[in-house]
Amino acid sequence: MINVIASIRVKGDKLSDFLEIFKSNLTSVREERGCIEYFPAVDIDADLPPQSLDENVVTIIEKWESLEDLSDHLNAPHMLAYKEKVKDIVEGVSIKVLQEA
């Protein structure tokens, strides 16, 4: 199983726009071969040091059956369309691809 944690920094006041676009793509992604889990998450204040909060970051939590499935996901037509739609409201992306130790 492959785990992905993607942190997406969204420009200033564009968080709701980003989430609307992202959520409109959820069904297509979740129907992909190998998708086990896929959802967006935002920071909440849990008052736990050394927690850092950032209201302009959306964290995407993903689980895939294999690296091949993840690769297919990244090249799927609906993902290419999604990337085009969000390109002007995203400032940066950081991705971690993990497997159980």
What do these predicted ranges mean?
Residues 11-13, 67, 100:
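Generic structural motif
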Residues 2-9, 41-74:
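Short, well-ordered beta-strand segments in beta-rich or mixed alpha/beta enzyme
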Residues 30, 65, 91:
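Short conserved AdoMet
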Residues 39-56, 81-101:
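Glycine-rich beta-strand-turn "strand-cap" elements at beta-sheet edges
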